[in-house]
Amino acid sequence: MENRIKRPRVDGECVKSINNGEFDRWDVEDTVAYLRGEGLQEWAQIFKDNGITGAGLLCLTEAHLEKMGVSPLGARLHILHCLQKLSQISTEPMKVFNDPIHGHIELHPLLLHFIDTPQFQRLRHIKQLGGTYLVFPGASHNRFEHSIGVGYLAGCLVKALNERQPELFITKQDILCVQIAGLCHDLGHGPFSHMFDGMFIPKARPADKWKHEIASVQMFDHLVEVNGLEAVMLHHGMRLPEDLIFIKEQIAGPLESAVLDQSQWPYKGRPVEKSFLYEVVANKRNGIDVDKWDYFARDCYHLGIQNNFDYQRFLRFARVCEVKGRKHICTRDKEVGNLYDMFHTRNCLHRRAYQHKVGNIIETMITEAFLKADPHIQIQGSSGRIFTISSAIEDMEAYSKLTDHIFEQILYSSGPELSEARAILQNIICRRLYKCVGQTTSETNVDVSQEKLLDWAKELARSKPTGTEGNLIAEDFVVSVIHMDYGMKEKNPINNVHFYCKNDPTKAIKIHKKQVSKLLPERFAEQLIRVYCKKTDDKSLEAAKKYFVQWCMDRNFTKPQDGDIIAPELTPLKQDWHAREDEDEEEEEKHRQNQTLPHHTPQRTGRNVKVDLFQARGETKL
């Protein structure tokens, strides 16, 4: 009878760490002890020789084992089966969603515990593009489906890096944390998305520097606590509190105050060796992240605008390279043009949809209605306390009840205290909107505050041209300043992107704009200044347009596109405007002359010259 090899018992500490889901903290000896305990002592030495620690166990595939020297297929499969027992993460069935953008997508069951909570389901009732839906009828999608898409794409990118570079030792816990961060990155959005944090809160609470990313972290903590998800996370092999810290850092950046020494690693959730993981969901370095990938595809789909960026191609070429001691996600050098196209797509979306002049004024009017209704709306929070729309951000239980429904709550109210707010929303529904009287730009970017906008409205009221009928006051004007950029204000985001070449995929390089094309933008940011008039009768609008042209002249802003039409008696008075137009015309005339001049044709005064291209050198026929 064949002698059976007695299976040695696994060390007690090793068993305890398995039960606690902390096997990724094992050193090489712990790994060897576990393998021997599973009857794999024949192959334990190979793991020891290759220096495999617990952090790398779940990253191993059959191909990795074969390269390490585990030749028999049966042995490789046996080892993989034993490694999978370390965590339930790789053995549980996935949940399938049918998404109109990404098709059939799979999400880990742990993610469902986050999705199936009131705090996450709240995102079903917050429009992704806020008031833009009232301009683009197809833009009816919500933060809910966008968040699921970001969670899915986050997993796609990290898994692609793991398959391409197993030496990164990306664990299943890493993948889950990145997916959860993608899933929960927008939990803090308020009614009508960016209208709430970009327009309403700055006016309702001007002293506060509130951002929806901070609210997302607070809502995430609230979600985990009230739904008892810490125990669920531990059951799925997560490490607490490190993984919770890591998830929140991906959403809002370092949780502690900024580190003065830039060389010091500011994050606590993951070590500097895994710095690239912080570039997946919200890439603070260059803005290339899965959040953009999803909203590009999803917003374009619902807006009816062509999306020119293919994230699938980026996934194919993404890899991690080390730069100055930190690891960054890089892409192939030949993809630099596609990345410029990506940021150009972002700019086009802002121009055509996100900053649409009608969509913007609708959100301005909604903001005005919310400000008037703010003291009269009561929302119950924790411990029975009552909050208003603007103070609900202080209490996550109250904030979780704040969605786009507040619009209908005001619109369908009957109390006299909400009459002013109700009237504004009724005007929106009936399309009685404030009218845009013009748009201009400044030669240099202006630091804009709420006080500056109010001062400009007062200046407009004083800019009445001579002979203009009607009187307008500051309260009749709304001044809006829109910032257009490539995502990093005046900076070129591609300057913060690293690439690699086919010849050496381990070395990161930078590619200057001049190496790509001479047709790329010289500037990466500008300001658009729009003026609206609240009075919508023809006489007031005609006067407001003349006020606006005069104000642009006084402020030395660019001439409005229709300035010569709406105020032909004013624009000739601004010499700078016409000097620029004369320069443009002279430039065009020179270009036209260069195009019409014959090339390589001998000229002689007073006589026609005919050239025989096939004549002998030195002969001329006249």
Swiss-Prot record:
The active site is at H212. Its EC number is 3.1.5.-. Residues 594-606 have a biased composition (Polar residues). Its cofactor is Zn(2+). The keyword Disulfide bond does not apply. Homodimer; in absence of GTP and dNTP. Homotetramer; in GTP- and dNTP-bound form. Interacts with rbbp8/CtIP. Belongs to the SAMHD1 family. This is Deoxynucleoside triphosphate triphosphohydrolase SAMHD1. It comes from Danio rerio (Zebrafish). The lineage of its organism: Eukaryota, Metazoa, Chordata, Craniata, Vertebrata.
